[in-house]
Regions:
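Helical mechanochemical/support elements of P-loop NTPase systems and associated helical scaffolds
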Residues: 31, 63, 94, 123, ...
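Residue-level signal for short, function-critical loop segments
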Residues: 55-56, 86-88, 175
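Phosphate-binding/switch region of NTP-binding enzymes
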Residues: 171-217
Length: 217
């Protein structure tokens, strides 16, 4: 005779597993419906180096926001903090991370550790050591994509450390064209118009959630 309970349980598992965007695979962080399906690992691979670049200088803020969104996804997958490392340089018009702003974005400032080493090579070193410490859910770093410090060997070290610790590492290279790298994914990000929210009382259109125009290499 057929065990109906076991059959129903099996069907439930199959249905749940077939729902798009339900979750990433065990070795990946879920990024939601659509994006998960476009990635070979069913999400953002944990033990890997990923690169983000702005499509143009005007998209630097949008790319930073996208990086923050990925950090939010990583925080949902782990109770550990996130390291955000940027080589110190004058912020000019791009500014720096702002606590209340990132909190409104969904990134808990209490779980975010900011580091500002003096140069790009120092930033890469801090990122590698942070990965090897196994203390973080996610390691992010901002390095000038034109820097000589961002060599193929440097990306190999980050990739190796990420694999050994199964910790995702995101490298934001600004708006410069990417150099040789072993990054598993390379994201090019541009800002996109948000969907307006209709304000019922006054029938006004309010700014909606952030959106991005993304290409993946």
């Amino acid at each position: 005779p057929v065990d109906k309970r076991a059959l129903i349980a099996d069907l439930k598992e199959r249905i749940a597993g077939g729902e798009p965007g339900n979750a990433g695979l065990p070795g990946a962080i879920s990024l939601g419906t659509g994006i998960n399906e476009a990635l070979p690992d069913g999400g953002l691979r944990k033990g890997a180096l990923h690169e983000i670049a702005a499509s143009a200088y005007r998209d630097m803020g949008a790319a930073t926001g996208f990086l923050a969104a990925l950090a939010v996804c990583a925080m949902k997958d782990s109770s550990r903090p996130v390291l955000w490392c940027e080589a110190w340089r004058p912020p000019f018009d791009m500014g720096r991370l702002h606590g209340p702003g990132i909190a409104a974005f969904g990134l808990d400032p209490a779980r975010l550790l900011l580091a500002a080493p003096p140069g790009d090579s120092d930033c890469l070193w801090v990122m590698e050591e942070a990965l090897r410490s196994r203390a973080f859910a996610f390691v992010a770093g901002e390095v000038d994509g034109r820097s000589s410090a961002l060599s193929l060997a440097a990306t190999r070290r980050l990739q190796r450390a990420a694999e050994e610790t199964q910790t995702p590492v995101l490298l934001f290279t600004g708006h410069a064209k990417g150099s040789a790298s072993v990054a598993v994914t390379r994201w090019h990000v541009a800002g996109a118009e948000s969907r307006n929210i209709l304000y019922a009382d006054e029938m006004e259109r309010l700014p909606g959630c952030p959106r991005w125009d993304i290409s993946l290499a």
